[in-house]
Amino acid sequence: MRKLRVLFQGDSITDMGRDRGDIRNMGSGYPLFVASNFRAARPNFDIDFFDLGISGDRVRDLRARWQSDCLDLRPDVLSVLIGINDTWRRYDSGDPSDTEEFERVYRSLLEDARSENPSLKIIIMEPFVLHVSEERASWREDLDPRIQAVRRVAKDYADAFIPLDGLLNAAAVDTCPEQWAPDGVHPSFDGAALIARYWLEAFDKIL
């Protein structure tokens, strides 16, 4: 019997400098914290973790590589965090992503994954931005409707949903947003550890 297979998918927040030539490499972000903390707590649990996030990806980029980077791996647990680049490209490149199309593509990814493996467990994390500057705060116009789209998708597909935008911004109330994500998007080690904590709490409920 093969080990339980957990796949992390997403963008740079998931990628975090992983060695793409080594499928076992977990980068330096929350997937590494998840894998190391889980194995430390349960060293005899038969489980494999895979991080296949790619920096810069939007949901349509996930669509383009979904067969090779998700379906062919046949995960038992699929974790997805995507969406901030769909917002970011509007502001740095003048290349917006339609929210309805974003939701449609997101649903198609999960529909395909569930069709491939009806017993698949899905963990969805919503995209987030922390208000480290007025510029980042201005992204709310684009990001908030996208977060609502992710929540609708999660209601229909997720076995566990992690409302990261709310959780991380709540954490920033008692400290400062830069502690968790210096640029408002990419987590610090503290931020990655906090995301991993939320993830493991959600995972425990569906394991």
What feature does the model see in each segment?
Residues I54:
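Conserved active-site regions of diverse hydrolases
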